[in-house]
Each structure stands twice: as C-alpha cells, then as structure tokens.
From Swiss-Prot:
Its EC number is 1.14.11.68. One of its GO terms (cellular component) is MLL3/4 complex. It comes from the Eukaryota. It comes from Homo sapiens. This is Lysine-specific demethylase 6A. It is an enzyme of class 1 (oxidoreductase). Its cofactor is L-ascorbate; Fe(2+). Residues 814-833 have a biased composition (Low complexity).
Length: 1401
C-alpha cells in the first residue's frame, strides 16, 4: 500500500481533538452560557470523517450512492466552523486542513481555499502534508492559477513520490504544461500518467488522446495521425472519444497539406467527419468542420445545411457565422453576408477575421467609411496578424475619402446599411438575446453531457404555427436565396414571405419559454456568470476545458466553436462556453480556456504564489491598469458584491466602445488569486493544435460537481485580523517587499526575500578587473593572492545552513538554504537534535495503510494485516519515535544500520523523504539590497597571460574558483601555452573525420543584445532553435559558403553606399532591417562529440598542455571521479559557428563549472549573470511560458536592467579561455565565423558540491533528469579522495549516511515482503542508473522488469515507479549492485583528512 501524504492517524487525532473541544464547549454551556445548540458529531461519524481528505476528490459519487457522505461532510463543515468560531480561531491547525479537505470534496472552492490558507499560516512545516499540498493544487487548478497549481503538485511528488494520486497530478500537469506550450514537459507527464496503474478520473484511452493531440499541437502531424488511428483500434473505445478522434482526423485532413493532395484529403476529411457525427450527432464543432469542407469543394448547399446544424447544436459560434458570411458573399448576397458577419462580431467583438471580411464587404459595396471602421476594429483585436497591411489599407481609404468632393458620399445611395444601423438588424439583435437565454438554460440543465457536450435542451414542443418552416420550405428558401438575382416577381414575393416566416421562426427559437434572461450565480460575494473569475458556471456539471483550434485554410483567422471537455476538478468554466471574445493569430491557432485569459507571453505566469499577510501587489509579476485596479478594490471593499465584468460582446458598440476598455491589455485580478485574465473575456493562447476544442471535448470521466458558480468568500472563521485576504502558497516567504508595483489592500504579494544563509552567493559589484597576471609581477601577485585568500574558503561559502530538516521552523527561499539540506547541510549533533525531538514527533506523520471506506465501500484495495506491506505503511506512530536526524554523521556504519532498524520498528516508512524530510527546493530571490543602476554593468574579471609560468601560477586557480567571480576571461592562454588551435579548425576537422555527426540548430540572425519575434514587431524571450543533424563535411561547406556570401553582400553594399563609411552603412542597415523582419535563417553546428580518443587523438593530446584545474581529466576534477563518460561534461565538445549562432541562456548541468576556448578566427560575445540571480531569470521564464531548465530563451537586457540584475558582457577572442564559475547563468552569440571547444570541470570545493546537490534536488522537483548522478559520484569520491575541507566532508558524509539508510531500510522491507534480491555486481565503467520512467537516479537496488531481465536489457525502474506499474512488484526482479558490507566499509573509511600545508594548482 502506498503512502498517501498525511497520516489518517492525524485526521483521526484531529477528529478526537474535535470531540474533546466539543466536551469543553458543552461544559461551558452547562455552566450557564445561553447559546444555540451547535451540531455535534458522533464517534462513528468522527471515525468516518478520518478517512476523508483531498485524495478522494473526483472519486466520491454524491449523485449516486454518496448522499450520506455528502450530508456527513456538510454536517462536519458546520460543526468545524461552529467550533472554530467559538474558539475564536484558537484551534489546532489540523482543523483548518480538514475543513479545507471537506469543502474541497463538497466543491466549495472559496471556502476550501480559505481553510487551506489558515492551515498554511499556522503550520510552519505545511510542506510535509502531501494531502494539503494536493488539495491546494486542486483549488488552484480549478481557478486556472496554473503556475501555483504546478508548484503545489510538483511539491506533492517531491515530498511523497509514491503519493496515491500521482496519476491525477501527472494528468493535470500534462494539461497545464500543454496550455503553457511547454510540450516536452506535457508529454512527459502524460506518459507518466499512462504507465501508472492506479485509478484515475480519465481513462487511459483519454490520456492517449491527449498525447495524440499534443503531437498535433506541435505540428507533428504524421505522429498525431498515427496515434489517432492507433487509438481507434482500442477495444471498447467510448463513443465520446471515438467521435472526437474522428473529428480530429477529419479536420487534420482538411487543413494539413502534408497528408496528401487536396481532392484525396477533402474526401477523407468528409468521411471522417461524417463518421464522427454518427458517433456524436450533436457535435456542433463537427458540423461546422463539415461545412468548411463542403465549402472548400464548392458544395454550397451542403455547406449551408452543415452550418445551420452547427448553429442548432452549439448555439452561438462566431466562427460559424463568419463562415456563413463568406459563403453569402461568394454567392453575391451582400445583405445576408452583412447580417452573418454582424452576428459573428456581436458574439465575439474581437473576431479579427469577421471584422476584416466585413470591411472587405463594405469596400466592395463602395462604402469606405464603414470599411474603415471595420478595419480599425480588426486592428484593435489582439488576434489580428496583419496589422501593418490593414493600417496601410486604412490610410489608402482615408486618402481616397479626402480626395472626394464634399457631400458626394451623402448623396450616394448605399447598398448596405451602415455599421451602426447593421448592429440593430433583426437577426443579430435577436441572436444576442437568444444567446443569453441559452446560456441560462444550460445552467439550469441537469448533469447531462450528451456525449461530452454541454448541450442546451430545446424548448418544450408547442403547437406548430403558420410561420414554422418545414424542411422542404427551408430548402426552397435556400434555393430562392441562391438565385435571388434571377427570380421572377412571383418568386420574389415567395422569397419575401419565406424570409419573414424564417425570421419569426428564429425569434421564437431564440426565446425558450421559462428561461431567465440574466445569468447570475446568486452566491454572496461571488462573481456573476460574466465575471472574469474562472469558476464552475453550471450547477451539477463538471468544469470544462474548451481548447479551440483556429482553422487556417480558405479563411485565415476564422475559427470553430468551443465545445468543452470536463475533467475532474477542471479549472475551466463549465457549461457551453461561447467563443465570444476568442482571438486568432492570423492562420495560427488559438486555445480558449474557460473564461480565463492565458496568453503565450505568460499572462498565466503572472499569477503569483502569494505571500502570507502581505498587502502589496505581486513584485515583477503584474502591472495593473486603472480599469482593472478599481473593480478589484471594489470587490475587496464590498463583501456582498463580486467582481463583475461584462462579456464584451453585444454590450459593446460596433465601433469598439467597451464597458471597461476597448482593447487595452488591462487585466483583472481575481479574488484570492484566482488568476489574472485579460479584460476582453475569453482567452487565447497561440498554439499549433487543430481543433483543440474538439481535442479536449468529451473527455470527461468519473466526477460530478455539485455547486454552481462561486466566488471566493471570506468566511468568519477564515478571516485574518483586519479582514486581510491571504492565500496560501506552497513556498513561504519572509521579509519586506521591495519594489512592489502598487499597493492594493487584500492582495498578497509574492516576493522572495533572501535571508542570510545563502552559500556561495557572490557580493556583486566588488569584482575588479585585475591587470596582467604574472608571477613576475610582485604587486599584481600580492593583489591576486590577497583577493583569493580573502574569498576562497573564508567567504560566503563558509556559511553553513544549520536548519534542522525535521524540525524546520522557518526557512528562507533560497535553494541553498533548504532544498538540499538532506545532503548539503551540516548535521547538528545528536544532543542538539534530541532537544528538539518533542517538536518533530508530530511532524513526522506515519503514512496510513489505505483510505477508509465510504458508505461501506473501500476506496482502495485493502491489504490483510497478516501480509507485510512493502512500504511499511501499516505502522501506527509511536511516542517513542527516534527522529531520523538523530543518527549522527560520525558513528560507525553498524550504529547507523542499527538506528535504521529502530526507525523501521518505530513506524517510519522507507521513503527517503520521510526519513529525511526537507522543504521542497525553491529558487533564490533577488539578492537584497538591490544593486544601484550604475553597478548593473560590472567589468568582467580578466587575466592576461604572457607565458607558461603565468598559466600555472597557483593563485590563477584560486581566482577562477572564487565565488565572487561568476566568470573569468583568461586572455592569451593559447599563445602563452603554445597551443596548436589549428587542430580544431574546420579544415583539420574535415580531414580527420568528415562524416562525423553534427547537431544543427536552425536559428534567426538577430542583433546580439536583442531577440525579436519572427515578424520583428516585439522583443521576446523565446529563442527559435530547431534541431536537425548533418555531418562535419556538410556543415563545413555551409560555413564556407556563408562566408563567401557575406563577402559578396559586403562588396554590393560598398558599391551602393559610397556616400557613407562601410561601418556606418552596415550597422545602420542591419539594425533597421533586422528589427523589421523577416530575419535571415542561419545554422549553428553544436554538441559535436570529441570523446573518441582514437578519432581525435591529436586534438585531445593537445589539451593536456592546459593547467590541471582546467583539464578535461584531473584528480581535482569531481567529474573525473564519476567513473563513466558523460558526453560534453567530462569529454570535449566542439561548436562550429557562423555569425549570429546562439547558445541560449542556461546554467551548466548540475551547476558545474565550464571551460570554453575560442578557436577562431572570429569572436564571440558573452552575457553572464551571477548565480544568485538565477531565481529572477527563472521567474522571467515562467512569465514568458518558458522552461528555465529545458527551454530555449534569450534574456531581454531591458527586463534584466529593470529587475536590477547585473550582466557581465564581454568579447571572447581567438585563444581566450572563458571560465564559467559554478551556477553562473550565461548565453553566447558568435560575432564572426569561428569554432569553440568546451567541457565541464568540478573543482573540489564545498561551494561546487553544494550547488551541484541543490540543482540535483531542484531537477527532481521539476521532473528533469540530473545529468550528473550525485549519489553515485559521492560514493566514488568517498572511495577515491581524501577530503580536508570540513564543510565538504560533512556534506559528502551526510549523503553517504542518507543513502546507506535508504538502502538498508528498503532491503529489509523487501526481504520482509518475501521479495528476492538478486546479486548483479557493477562492471567497469558501467554508467550510473536512472529510472526509465521518471529519470531519477537509482542507486544499489535496481527494479528491473522480468522481461528485460531475461533479455539482459535491464530496463531500470525506481521503487516508486515500479510499484505504480505493478502494485505488488510481481512483474519485477530486484537487482543488488553493492554488498551492504562494502558500502559500510566505504562509509567507515571516509574520514576527515588533515588539511594540506599549502594550496597547489
């Protein structure tokens, strides 16, 4: 049985405490208090409640047989609230956690958030409670606060990798990363969800659909097509999934040119869509797509019928009406086209395509004034992709108008009503009222998805009236309209009659009887239905994900409707979500997500992780405009009125008058951090998907919601003093908040305030650029040695964080201080630990054996108490628990293992996290106080070498590794050492191994200090860098031809610009052209492996001339002790460049140092940021929806300047060596044609080891593989190295201690469970092992599938992934790589060595 976070014993204890509190209250009443009788819980009810927490979310069926459970939860909430009120909030923190769980299960999200907030504020070690973090993540997910939800879910998996709802977490992480366009992370989490055999609210087929759709989103159409077709072969595939898969395949064949010729594609598209409609006849989306297909092959009547069906099924769709308008315009029916376009823009005031088409229609009818108004509205839309072309057209029309005689337009008869008149035409006017009515009808609908759609039910059938048109009459009407210009008088009369009847019929259909016209939640302090706060808007229905793809074929920018997809605790607005303000990006795609606006530039990233008791706006996160600021203040000040925002559709005028603001990027802050949304209403996100609405349509499964729309309410029991609304975060911050953008009462702030103990944090601004370093220069030598001696060993690295992991009371936000304290902190003595034991016992909660039953039915498979559980989760906590941290570093291994056995007997599981619980790692905040602006461009530390003696001068090593120097440039190294750089020239490389593989990155040629989007209109952080492969010979040919082409261009410029100097001409011309775009495409040859000493013997031998501290292999290099090859780290890699080739921003793998030598002949420009600021850059990446660890990003220097981030900037010339210190962030661009060689180095320092371990833990939190196996490396260091630095020794020894305990405890658990452990010793140079599923390092005990073991392929799993795949491990064998006696011997023999008499190079 798996650990599921907080122990049920804790819940039972809370319930028992609740009983004690009740007795006290009863005694108070008996003594004379006159109070109303408060509800009380029986012992049986308290026991039942002990098994209810966030882990049951989505698995409790209130609408089936769970009425008793729902009633019990409601009663418990009333009892808890009553008790807390009477105790004036002075109750145990667990009460608030339980109250949060109960409200979450009842889907009362505002109350759940409020209760979780109080628990968070009261419980200093809240991070140990996985169920709390999970519940908090679910609430954030519900409110579309994706960045918060991601952090909460990641921390659950970090503190408890075996969490029983890990599959639910991976599913939601996959969805959120997909929306954030982090496709690699999304795919990884979907795959992790797929391999988990635990129950989930989505079926595996639905998860496979998400993976297929992810490929489609990435424009990997062949992979997507293959995945969809494979999914159709699944047995017992539900009709909902089948219909959606067929819909996707149909639309892909219509839109993707790669799938065949047009005729074949359209034929397949129509077949797939027809099959989809057979599976789900009520899909308005499929009808719309079918109409588009018919339209593209000229079947006008079929297209009209399909569009009509689409409108009937999915009600208002701006895309459908726009497509109808296009058809009418093609049929030369301008009046009908006008009405259709007006319907489209009333449904979606920002529908750029409809505005442009409408403008074209007016222009064709010679009404330029109306055309200008339409074009202006199109340019105001964020989805408008050709603003410049429209602006030019507007100028042209305005110039024409100026040249016309005055009054000529007024005297001219208009073919069409003006835009203002058209706004009130009968059909559009009725449409808007109809839409409001239909939305209300859907809110009152029962929990009926009708195949996955929230479909409105038709009105009750009434007696047929004379205006009711039969299908025959409707067909006749269409025929008459199609031939309007060729009708005789009788036919024209018939057409008028039929059209009038048609309008009457529409009016009747648009007013369903008994349906309210106003959408409202009726919830106190909650938003209305049109509020920008993303909440559930359909009583009894699941929230939906409405992801809509923008079609890009015949009408760029015309988009489909928005079907929805329900998901347990989906963060998306429920019910049918009209695309009322959806946007397009030219012919690209758009994702609509409920009512929440998420853009690719990171608006969702602006959602802060709020700080407790803070009163100011998020730092560097959100800029409020006045239009958004006021509603927020009003909401906080008015306890009975929610933040109301109009839907901005028909309430807006035709010329862009808006209730709030016509187009500006103002944002509304949601109550209690529910998300930041664009004021235009429905959001968009650039995406590459096709039909994302259909993509996530139908995929609902097993959960039902119960309440309607809800805002965030401050209940009495949840209000902090002063009525300040605080929202919990899973990272706690302390300190004041500098640089807050504004101050609005009630909105917590998110500022990382770093406290004192950050190790290796350089004091910026102090670095000076020394002159020539030479052992013959006594003055300089003294300066250098003084600097080194003052800073190395006795500087910031001397500080060691003594926070006790198990009794953690307050921690700063630096990763250095908390995340890796399990390895990288000094361990307190047993005596000091014992003094804190009483505080730590309650926090070391024993995981429970399983979830209690609900209504007599077990929620998980219970295990017989006679059977020994692998994870030892059946033990109850005992008052005699020995804190794991009381095991000192210094006792022998035998004492350690004896203590481990006691730990097991006392009820601790074998989970490393429970043995050594540490707070999840967090990025450091920006160093405080911030540097003054004149210190943000510091000089780069540079050393000039004259001879070999200078290169081997000992202080050079000390200077480079000094944490105060994030980077050092060693000038003239090649000349001083007489290195033959020609061995690495392109010519020599081709002669040596011309067919050697080269990884190619295709990039855009840009100015070094700028990064523009492909159109050249705005600066962005995302750096285009697409991967492919070639050979050295082919890249050499490209490199040479690029140089020749540049020479030709230079000669042409000289002949055309003789009036100016060459330099002025080139710089000004390039600067202007590059900013305008489109940019020239270049290719960068990167990561060329030079590890083979047979192929590259001469080259590698030449590098042995280097000083020991920068060599690829040396005794003082940690990476030389890994024991196997890590390509590019302890081997050499080569880079072949043309001007503009970019290495995007990054820190080295596991924060190791790096060495880079420029071979030449051209230069490179470097940009460097000190390690202490990586948290700031991580925040910028989050804002821009980029993955700091794995993404491709190029920082905007203006952003860094505003955030007070210092940037070292320098030129690396041929022969210069650049030393990047541990953890330094850097990015590089080639100025000329050049080659570079590089590798990593690990100095034997406490600072390097500490930063490496911190990144190891951060990678684990982020589900990213650590390239350096730190556990494996630490044991090899203990075998090979004598360590004299006490801080480094303690960190390594503690890592050994921790892993020794893990191995012993796991061994004992496996043996007790009857699982055989098979000896499988390590071979020479065998690589360290990683889990094939989650990619964490696996040490000593390898879980290998039976099949791979028999085949000798050895596919390794970690314990947690093995158990998720096979609960009882019956499909796995366990291989042991080290004898416990060997590990004990290494541990005992690793002792602190006496200090060396003097430092050496």
């Amino acid at each position: 049985m798996k650990s599921c976070g907080v122990s049920l014993a804790t819940a039972a204890a809370a319930a028992a405490a609740f009983g004690d509190e009740e007795k006290k209250m009863a005694a108070g009443k008996a003594s004379g208090e006159s109070e109303e009788a408060s509800p009380s819980l029986t012992a049986e009810e308290r026991e039942a409640l002990g098994g209810l927490d966030s882990r049951l979310f989505g698995f409790v069926r209130f609408h089936e047989d769970g009425a008793r459970t729902k009633a019990l939860l409601g009663k418990a909430v009333r009892c808890y609230e009553s008790l807390i009120l009477k105790a004036e909030g002075k109750v145990e923190s667990d009460f608030f956690c339980q109250l949060g769980h109960f409200n979450l299960l009842l889907e009362d999200y505002p109350k759940a958030l409020s209760a979780y907030q109080r628990y968070y504020s009261l419980q200093s070690d809240y991070w140990k409670n996985a169920a709390f973090l999970y519940g908090l993540g679910l609430v954030y997910f519900h409110y579309n606060a994706f960045q918060w939800a991601i952090k909460a879910f990641q921390e659950v998996l970090y503190v408890d990798p075996s969490f029983c709802r890990a599959k639910e977490i991976h599913l939601r992480l996959g969805l959120m990363f997909k929306v954030n366009t982090d496709y690699e992370s999304s795919l990884k989490h979907f795959q992790l969800a797929l391999v988990d055999c635990n129950p989930c609210t989505l079926s595996n087929a639905e998860i496979q659909f998400h993976i297929a759709h992810l490929y489609e989103t990435q424009r990997k159409y062949h992979s997507a097509k293959e995945a969809y077709e494979q999914l159709l072969q699944t047995e017992n595939l539900s009709a909902q999934v089948k219909a959606t898969v067929l819909q996707q395949l149909g639309w892909m064949h219509h839109t993707v040119d790669l799938l065949g010729d047009k005729a074949t594609k359209e034929s397949y598209a129509i077949q797939y869509l027809q099959k989809s409609l057979e599976a789900d006849p009520n899909s308005g989306q499929s009808w719309y797509f079918l109409g588009r297909c018919y339209s593209s092959i000229g079947k006008v009547q079929d297209a009209f019928i399909s569009y009509r069906q689409s409108i009937d099924k999915s009600e208002a769709s701006a895309d459908t009406w726009c497509s109808i308008g296009v058809l009418y315009q093609q049929q030369n029916q301008p009046m009908d086209a006008l009405q259709a376009y007006i319907c489209a823009v009333q449904l979606d005031h920002g529908h750029a395509a409809a505005w442009m088409d409408l403008g074209t229609l007016y222009e064709s009818c010679n009404q330029p004034q109306d055309a200008i108004k339409c074009y202006l509205n199109a340019t105001r839309s964020k989805s408008c992709s050709n603003t410049s072309a429209l602006a030019a057209r507007i100028k042209y029309l305005q110039a024409q108008l100026c040249n016309l005689p005055q009054g000529s337009l007024q005297n001219k008869t208009k073919l069409l009503p003006s835009i203002e008149e058209a706004w009130s035409l009968p059909i559009p006017a009725e449409l808007t009222s109809r839409q409001g009515a239909m939305n209300t009808a859907q809110q009152n609908t029962s929990d009926n998805w009708s195949g996955g759609h929230a479909v409105s039910h038709p009105p009750v059938q009434q007696q047929a009236h004379s205006w009711c048109l039969t299908p025959q009459k409707l067909q006749h009407l269409e025929q008459l309209r199609a031939n309007r210009n060729n009708l005789n008088p009788a036919q024209k009369l018939m057409l008028e009659q039929l059209e009038s009847q048609f309008v009457l019929m529409q009016q009747h259909q648009m007013r369903p009887t008994g349906v309210a016209q106003v959408r409202s939640t009726g919830i106190p302090n909650g938003p209305t239905a049109d509020s920008s706060l993303p909440t559930n808007s359909v009583s009894g229905q699941q929230p939906q994900l409405a992801l809509t793809r923008v079609p890009s074929v015949s009408q760029p920018g015309v988009r489909p409707a928005c079907p929805g997809q329900p998901l347990a605790n989906g963060p998306f607005s429920a019910g049918h979500v009209p695309c009322s303000t959806s946007r397009t990006l030219g012919s690209t795609d758009t994702i609509l997500i409920g009512n929440n606006h998420i853009t690719g530039s990171g608006s969702n990233g602006n959602v802060p992780y709020l700080q407790r008791n803070a009163l100011t706006l998020p730092h560097n996160r959100t800029n409020l405009t006045s239009s958004a600021e006021e509603p927020w203040k009003n909401q906080l000040s008015n306890s009975t009125q929610g933040l109301h925002k109009g839907q901005s559709s028909h309430s807006a005028g035709p010329n862009g008058e808006r209730p709030l603001s016509s187009t500006g990027p103002s944002q509304h802050l949601q109550a209690a951090g529910s998300g930041i949304q664009n004021q235009n209403g429905h959001p968009t996100l650039p995406s590459n998907s096709v039909t994302q609405g259909a993509a996530l349509n139908h995929l609902s499964s097993h959960t039902a919601t119960s309440g309607g729309q809800q805002g965030i309410t401050l209940t009495k029991e949840s209000k902090p003093s002063g009525n300040i609304l605080t929202v919990p975060e899973t990272s706690r911050h302390t300190g004041e908040t500098p640089n807050s953008t504004a101050s609005v009462e009630g909105l917590p702030n998110h500022v990382h305030q770093m406290t004192a103990d950050a190790v290796c944090s350089p004091s910026h601004g102090d670095s000076k650029s020394p002159g020539l370093l030479s052992s013959d220069n006594p003055q300089l030598s003294a300066l250098l040695m003084g600097k080194a001696n003052n800073n190395v060993g006795t500087g910031t690295c001397d500080k060691v964080n003594n926070i006790h992991p198990a009794v953690h009371t307050k921690t700063d936000n630096s990763v250095a201080s908390s995340p890796s304290s399990a390895i990288s902190t000094a361990t307190p003595s047993p005596k000091s630990t014992e003094q804190t034991t009483t505080n730590s016992v309650t926090s070391l909660n024993s995981p429970h054996s399983g979830l209690h039953t609900i209504n007599g039915e077990g929620m998980e498979e219970s295990q017989s108490p006679m059977k020994t559980d692998l994870l030892l989760v059946n033990h109850k906590p005992s008052p005699q628990i020995i804190p794991s941290m009381s095991v000192s570093i210094y006792p022998s291994s035998a004492e350690v293992l004896k203590a481990c056995r006691n730990l097991g007997k006392n009820g601790l599981s074998n989970s490393s996290i429970l043995l050594d619980k540490c707070p999840p790692p967090r990025p450091p905040s920006s160093p405080y106080p911030p540097l003054p602006k004149d210190k943000l461009n510091p000089p780069t530390p540079s050393i000039y070498l004259e001879n070999k003696r200078d290169a081997f001068f000992p202080p050079l090593h000390q200077f480079c590794t000094n944490p105060n120097n994030p980077v050092t440039v060693i000038r003239g190294l090649a000349g001083a050492l007489k290195l033959d750089l020609g061995l690495f020239s392109t010519k020599t490389l081709v002669e040596a191994n011309n067919e050697h593989m080269v990884e190619v990155r295709t990039q855009l040629l840009q100015p070094a200090d700028e990064n523009w989007d492909p159109t050249g209109t705005k600066k962005i952080w995302h750096c285009e860098s697409n991967r492919s492969h070639t050979t050295i010979a082919k890249y050499a040919q490209y490199q040479a031809s690029s140089f020749q082409e540049s020479l030709r261009e230079e000669n042409e410029k000289r002949s055309h610009h003789k009036d100016h100097s060459d330099s002025e001409s080139t710089s000004s011309d390039n600067s202007g052209r590059r900013r305008k775009g489109p940019f020239k495409t270049i290719k960068f040859g990167t990561n060329i492996d030079l590890s083979d000493d047979k192929k590259w013997k001469l080259q590698l031998h030449e590098l042995t001339k280097l000083p020991a501290f920068v060599r690829v292999v040396s005794a003082g290099n940690l990476l030389s002790h890994v024991g196997h090859t890590i390509l590019g780290m302890n081997t050499v890699q080569l880079y072949m460049k043309v001007p503009g080739s970019r290495t995007p921003g990054h820190q080295e793998n596991n924060n190791f140092c790096s060495v880079n030598i420029n071979i030449g002949p051209g230069d490179c420009e470097w940009f460097v940021v000190p390690e202490g600021y990586w948290g700031v850059l991580n925040d910028f990446c989050e804002k821009n929806n980029l993955n700091f660890l794995m993404g491709s990003w190029w920082p905007n220097l203006e952003d860094l300047y505003e955030a007070n981030v210092p940037v070292y900037r320098f030129i690396q010339r041929p022969g210069d060596l650049v030393w990047i210190n541990a953890g330094t962030v850097h990015w590089v661009q080639a100025i000329g044609w050049c080659n570079n060689i590089a590798w990593n180095v690990g100095p034997l320092t406490a600072c390097q080891y500490k930063l490496a371990v911190e990144r190891y833990e951060w990678n684990k939190l982020q589900s990213v593989k650590s390239i350096v196996p730190m556990v494996h490396l630490s044991w090899n260091m203990a075998r090979n190295i004598k360590v004299s630095d006490p801080k480094l020794f303690e960190m390594i020894k503690y890592c050994l201690l921790r892993t020794l305990k893990q191995c012993q405890t796991l061994r004992e658990a496996l043996i007790a469970a009857g699982k055989e452990i098979i000896w499988h010793g390590r071979t020479k140079e065998e690589p360290a092992h990683y889990c094939s599923i989650c990619e964490v390092e696996v040490f000593d005990l390898l879980f290998v599938t039976n099949e791979s073991n028999s085949r000798k392929t050895y596919i390794v799993h970690c314990q947690d992934c093995a158990r998720k795949t096979s609960g009882n491990l019956e499909n796995f064998v366990v291989l042991e790589q080290y004898k416990m006696e060997d590990l004990m011997q290494v541990y005992d023999q690793f002792t602190l060595a006496p200090p060396l008499p003097s430092a050496s190079s």
